[in-house]
Amino acid sequence: MYFQRTLKSDLSCQSVGLHSGRKVNMRIRPASSDEGIILVRTDTRYRQMIRVCLENVTDTTLATTIGSSGAAISTVEHILSALSGMGVDNAIIEVDAPEIPIMDGSALPFVNMLKLVGIRTQEKLKKYLVVKKPVSVSEGESFAMLAPSSSFEITYKIEFDHPLIKEQSYHLKLSDETYEKEICSSRTFGFLKDVEYLQAKGLALGGSLKNAVILDEKRIINKEGLRSHNEFVKHKILDAIGDLSLIGMPIVGHFIAYKSGHKLNSMLVKALLEQQENWTTASFLNCQDAHGQNTREKFSIRDIPARKILGAIHA
C-alpha cells in the first residue's frame, strides 16, 4: 500500500457499550489525507473532537480510553485495530456515548462493514514509523518490545492459570489479508468470577456471552465454543494492534510481547516516541532502507529480559 487510504462512504452501526451497558450509535466517515483518526462525541454540546494519539490517552484500565478537553471515549482498541489492520489511515469516528460499541467482542463486524462500504486510495503517500533500535518496557513479569524489521511483525505470548489457556503464543506478519483471516474474529475474553465482581462494581454492565468468551474454573461457558484454538492470544494481538495505532502511522518493526496489556502497550509507544534516535519516518518506497538494510536487524538474547518469550519468537 503506497498511498494513504480512507473509506469510500459512511458506515453506521449500533451495539451496547461493554462497560456502560448503554446502547451506542456509531458512524464512521471518510477523512482527508493526513487527517488521521479522529473521534467525535456527538452527544456533547460542542461535538467534542478527540485526535487519536498517545498524548490523548487518559486511561488504560480494562480498556484504552482517549480524551481531550473534558470529553472521553473508552474501549477504542477494537475499532482502531480494525482500521489499522485494514490499512485505513484517515477516518472520523462519531459516537453518541462515552464508549465504542462492543459488537460481538471482536473486530470482525467492523472489518465486514469496512469491506461493505469499500476502502479508497488517496493522493498522498503513507508515512511509516520505522524502528531503528530495540525499545522495551516491562512491569513485573510482563514485557513489550519493538525491534527493527523489514515489515510489521507481531510475536505474542500469554500465560493464564486455566486448563483451557495455559500458554499460547502466535507470530505473524501483518497485512490486510493476515489481519482479516487470522486476527479480526478473535473475541475478548474474561473469567466468570471477574465479570461478576466487575458488574457488582458497576462495570462490564454490557458484557455477555454475545460479546465475550467467558470461562469458569474449568470450561468455556459459551455454547458455540471458540472460533480458533488460539483465540485468546489472537485477541491480545488484536488489542495490541489497536493500541499501537496510537503512534499515528503504520509501523515497520517487530512487536514482541509477553503477558502485555493496554497499559504496557501504551508505555511502549511512549518509550519509543521519546527516543528519536530509535526510530525514523519513511514512505513505503524507501522504508526498507531507513535502517540501512533490507532485512531485520538481529538482536541477541540479552536484549530480551523476559526469556519466556523466546519460545514464541521462533514459533
Curated annotation (Swiss-Prot):
Pathway it works in: Glycolipid biosynthesis; lipid IV(A) biosynthesis; lipid IV(A) from (3R)-3-hydroxytetradecanoyl-[acyl-carrier-protein] and UDP-N-acetyl-alpha-D-glucosamine: step 2/6
Keywords on record: Hydrolase, Lipid A biosynthesis, Lipid biosynthesis, Lipid metabolism, Metal-binding, Zinc
Residues annotated to bind Zn(2+): 78, 235, 239
Gene Ontology terms: cellular component: membrane
Any one GO biological process: lipid A biosynthetic process
Recorded catalytic activity of this chain's protein: a UDP-3-O-[(3R)-3-hydroxyacyl]-N-acetyl-alpha-D-glucosamine + H2O = a UDP-3-O-[(3R)-3-hydroxyacyl]-alpha-D-glucosamine + acetate
Cofactor: Zn(2+)
Active site: 262
Record EC number: 3.5.1.108
SUPFAM superfamilies: Ribosomal protein S5 domain 2-like
Source organism superkingdom: Bacteria
Keyword Metal-binding in annotation: yes
GO molecular function ontology, one term from the record: metal ion binding
Function: Catalyzes the hydrolysis of UDP-3-O-myristoyl-N-acetylglucosamine to form UDP-3-O-myristoylglucosamine and acetate, the committed step in lipid A biosynthesis.
Family according to the record: Belongs to the LpxC family.
Protein name, UniProt field: UDP-3-O-acyl-N-acetylglucosamine deacetylase
The encoding gene: lpxC
